[in-house]
Design a protein with these regions (language model features):
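C-terminal helix-to-coil terminal segments
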Residues: 84-140
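Rossmann-like adenosine-cofactor binding region
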Residues: 1-90
Length: 140
């Protein structure tokens, strides 16, 4: 910690209250659903920013919108949204938010791997077998 100039804070409420920037990088689980809620947003510093490039449901979007509209926090950067692919239209008119179209996986390697999976699925299906990534049961 000293070498990196950081301090580990195991208590999320203290972490939220002390942080200048909160950047979410965790999976969506029952424990993390709306981990950033109205109470935690109220604890944030007025000049704090929140960044979410993980899962939209990690943030209570209504509470975040209210905090952004009222200036309760300085701003937000969002790459994911609660009801993807839809984005809450209230976010479009808020000047202190940056909205991205879920670019977190948009690396060259990620796109290449996705393309390879598509090709594999098509080949398997064309050979009369069930594609490994088939989503709809019973589809032929």
């Amino acid at each position: 910690e000293d070498e990196l100039g950081i301090t580990f804070e195991p208590d999320i409420d203290r972490l939220v209250a002390r942080s200048d920037i909160i950047s979410l990088h965790c999976p969506l689980t029952p424990e993390t659903d709306k981990i950033i809620n109205a109470d935690r947003i109220a604890q944030m510093k007025g000049d704090a920013y929140i960044i979410n490039s993980s899962r939209g449901e990690l943030i209570d979007e209504d509470a975040l919108i209210h905090a952004l509209e009222t200036g309760r926090i300085a701003g937000a950067g969002l790459d994911v949204y609660t009801h993807e692919p839809a984005v809450d239209s209230r976010l479009f008119d808020i000047p202190n938010v940056v909205l991205l179209p879920h670019l977190g996986s948009a690396t060259f390697e990620g796109r290449e791997a996705s393309g390879e999976r598509v090709i594999t699925n098509i080949r398997v299906w064309a050979d009369g077998h069930r594609p490994p990534d088939q989503v709809l049961e019973g589809w032929q």
